[in-house]
């Protein structure tokens, strides 16, 4: 049965009639007892209404009229005294001071008299106490609901006991029952001062109890009655569950409507307090992400379950399923529902562990789908546009060293449409959020129109395939559910954990004893061990020394993963078979890489020394020549952009562009020379990509005037200088030991290999900020130590500004001044943003500058991968990983380790690694 309250304006109440049960004794718990204090007359005339707890009443009357009038009087027995200290008896009345009882008198040989106890509403769990049944007393009673007699065999005996633990035992009460009534009697003599009692309860709801009494002995001419709230925890454990939902479609059903998550749901009785069957107070719970709530392990009866929306003008679902015809419908209207819960009651079913909603319930029975539908008067909707770097359709925000962290996409235009009407028009901010607050609710719903930026596609489009790149996207948007829009273009995309391609230099000529040494290799970017300690096959040998010789620049074609490398002049490592003008291509065929000549600038220009003359000395047994040509012939860095390969022809100081699809389509561009006073000293080498445009880095080497220190420049192809990089900052110790420090300050370019000679070798963007890798040319002039620098330049909204004192863009780095290992000044104004020190405790020595000669920021990563040396051993080629957020050195991946038995197996500390690039593929084909 469900009754709808209509006098509550703002609360949604589900009223489930139960009891306020406060104390536990074995498997029975007890609540309020009926107060008989108003029964003062020895004779009962008309009905008397008596209070039962705070909010219920019970009516006491004579069922037989004037012809048989019972004699009754209130009897409040003090608890805890000698005559009333039995613990089970005390538990029935909880922490009350008195046992509230009614005395019913009957003289020997007098006709029996009867009383009737009647409630206005059904009572679900109540216990009837009858005491002082002795000396041949005879008591009978029966019950009914709405005039229909109860099967009295359904009543349970809970306790047969006595009032006192200290007095002599009372007589034993005999119980006899059939379908129509229960009879009580006593045929034993006991201590008249120690009263006996029996406590019973019905298993079905009742509203009337008739009790009749007759005495057969003048020594016992009264019995006592008590009525108390109670519950049988072994048979009457219930749960209430349901959903709170936004009734967006006015359907009064939670199906296809969004849930209300995080909503506090309250439960109470009319007197305001609820206890579960473990005696714990229960008053509220919170809906989960599905809008689901439940109250577990409570006794059957009458409750109120409600929510209090923050908006007092909240409207509710228009229809109510008062007969529980549809399990998914709204069960509340005008603020409340009333339902009775008991075994076999309407909607009450056994708990089923195969039902997902019942999994956490410990009760025996449950009434499910007590659903509450809310109609939003004005609704607000919002969404988030983000850069989905790995295109997995999810916004990944977890910070790890080897995965992308998706970022908000600002500047995206979004419109809100009601059918064809534009309701709002907004632009996403720095947080990527677009919001439409306080728009009228419409039953047809709204559409968010995403004006996709050029070149981008949506990665989580709900109905694949997604619209083409740059096309407008229409998406359904609903309240209380953030619409996530993942966008990606090819430039920003990279699959999870891509392979990394890197150059490892081999000794001697390409056709000499190290011809088969690997030069171009790939390894997993998420490697957690040194490569030489990883299982066979983890590192792939793509091209050998005999195939490509000495190369530096590496470029990866995102379309198919082909890798391009360009010739490089390095001491004791000869050019490949096609000489100084060669660009090689390594491609996968039948799961195997094959390498061939892709482009020869010397041949293309019909001039065999256009890229410089090979100045190596062959055979290259113990000596090599031509060191003065390092950085001046062959090629520099290499990048691929928009279907073309770019590199720098060092001999002519030109930018070379070659079409990937047709190498006959190539072009040479003059590069602006910023070295006004000594134009011959201009040494461009590095390339990068900023805002979709090629940028170039180089140094004025000062080799024409060795008294000065080189200066670096970063510029656009147009010659617009983005950044000037003075190289006169302190650099700590190039090498240090127990008591020595070899100064690391930069010098002008020369043929003196042990001097540190700055060479801007790579440009890497981290968002709007730039990372400048500075290779030590001295490490390529001989087999001696090369020590590298790495500078960060932060964009202030107008220009790039170099780090200073280890701080960039207001963010402190890892090496504030002084940053040298022994406290020596190191870096611009004596501090460095990135920690590039190395200390080897075994030998008590190290270097203050072993940073990166080539830097990689995989799209979306917060880390910088750099080709470097020495992470935990001496003479070790290493890929180091730094945190771009704070400059901390996180870890290193050893690529090679110099062998004491065979020191010529690699270049050790002498610039043994070259360029490095991730193998990222295009997402948009």
From Swiss-Prot:
Glycoprotein keyword on record: yes
Signal peptide: 1-26
Keywords carried by this UniProt record: Glycoprotein, Secreted, Signal
Glycan attachment sites: 47, 95, 142, 166, 283, 334, 344, 378, 401, 511, 642
InterPro entries: Ig-like_fold (IPR013783)
GO CC terms of this entry: extracellular region
SUPFAM superfamilies linked: Hypothetical protein PA1324
Subcellular location, record wording: Secreted
Gene3D superfamilies on file: Immunoglobulins
Family the UniProt entry places it in: Belongs to the serine-aspartate repeat-containing protein (SDr) family.
Protein name (record): Colossin-D
Protein source organism: Dictyostelium discoideum
Lineage, opening ranks: Eukaryota, Amoebozoa, Evosea, Eumycetozoa, Dictyostelia
